[in-house]
Amino acid sequence: QIVRTLKAKDAETKLNKLITLAITMLLAVTILMALCTPLLTKLYVNGSPETMALATSFTLWCMPQIFFYGLYTVVGQILAAKDHFTAYAWSSVGANIISCIGFGTFIALFGRATEHPLDFWTADKIALTAGTWTLGVAFQALVLFIPLTKIGLKYRPIFGLRGIGLRSMGPVAAWSVGIVVIDQLANIVITRTSTNAPMLAQQQFGINPLDVAGNASYQNAYMLPYSLIAVSLATAIFPKISRAVADHNIAEARIDLSQALRNMGVIMCYFAVAFVVMPVPIILALLPSVSVREAILMAGPLVTLGVGLPFASAYLIIQRTFYAFEDGKSPFIFMLFAMGIQAVSVIIGAKLLPPTEWTTMIGMVGAMSYILPIPILYAMLRKRFENNIDGPRIAISYLKSIGAAVATMFIGVTVRDSVYQLVGAQIGAVDGHMNWIQAVACAALLAIVAFIVYVGMLRLLRSEEFKEAIALISSRIPGLRKPTSPNDRLEQDDAENGE
């Protein structure tokens, strides 16, 4: 809808109406969720009254993030539709820096809080951790208004629904709400299962709860691959497909979708390799306060989720493509199958497996839930593209990328112990040791080895998408983007001469 609005003569007025509507709705939802915080905590968390009270306090501090994440998405999509990706992509870095300052201050004042009792968490400590996290998310959203002004759109509140495409957005929004409901119902099952795992392991086997992967391990593992990589790449690709669909150019949209899926497959298969080959160094490099023991607990779900990363990322692009066609029903049907598979499989798995394996099982189920319903997704997508979505070419590309990834995983797993020894590190739940510098060194060395092997395999398999994927990544990194048209080259030459 944003792409269509930008083509209108009074685009600024309509976009201001759209942003104002989004702000109003987000405020209403955020306030409602804040009022329902105790109930939501009971839905998601199992534990003692003290645990529930602490979870409620943290949740209440984090509730404003609903508003700011929503605002970030709306404003960011406007920037993306105008091909301004830099601020949208890098504002999250600022949010992470603010969060790290808060967590770093916490560690400096109080030490690591992993094994402290519940009464350790006083109001000031909760505010310092959850509060700075929310402050970072607020920065991530609000800073986007600066580039929004630079592209010629000065936001001012304008209330009104006429002319913003609400009639066409309404059904899509309704189906999207349905997706959120389905997703959260499955998340309730998953979160309660993973939260119970450490407590039940202690009751049944006498195992220290800190030695069992719980919900924190699952959530951290999930956030690493998906939000940092897949969402960023899908955001960069989506406006191009939207413009083609808005112009009723199905042939161009088909080319864009095919290229996007094939490029995403090449990129995501490499990251899947990284998560399988070196999960512990990656976790320790990105989360310096985590111990080796905790990193090992997080490694299981990270590996299993990494396997499904190429398919979850492909779905993200396909979902946005359906939205470009103003079709919210098809993504809803897919998510109904995917989340149904997750919820049912987790319930069955919790009955058959010991609690020590639950979180890894959840990661595996999450990966499979995006793989198994692919035929359904393919059938629905073909109808939108006149029964032709360049399927054979996409399938061959993914088979080549997966083949190269499997070979790279085998070689990477074979050499990783030698790399650990080279930097003086050791992986073990009891006697493991790896500091931050060693983790970064291991991750870098193994990434280089994996990259060389992966590229070699892609070349051997004659993958045409590899070069396109490299060009796509380079185009999103400031300073590396190459001009692709005569006008672009002239503008770059003028800029360089001006300097």
Regions found by a protein language model. Name each.
Residues Q1-E499:
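Membrane-embedded alpha-helical bundles of multi-pass transporters/translocases
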